[in-house]
């Protein structure tokens, strides 16, 4: 019961960290591709 009520508290920081990480990785890969070609 407590896990269901605590899910938003776990997901909010997780999403806040995962989305910028994915954005940085995709951006760095895009920059590397542009530098190579």
Curated annotation (Swiss-Prot):
The chain crosses the membrane at residues 7-27. It is a single-pass membrane protein. GO terms for cellular component: chloroplast thylakoid membrane; photosystem I. Keywords: Chloroplast, Membrane, Photosynthesis, Photosystem I, Plastid, Thylakoid, Transmembrane, Transmembrane helix. This is Photosystem I reaction center subunit VIII. May help in the organization of the PsaL subunit. GO terms for biological process: photosynthesis. It is found in: Plastid, Chloroplast thylakoid membrane. It comes from the Eukaryota. Belongs to the PsaI family. It comes from Morus indica. Its main location: plastid.
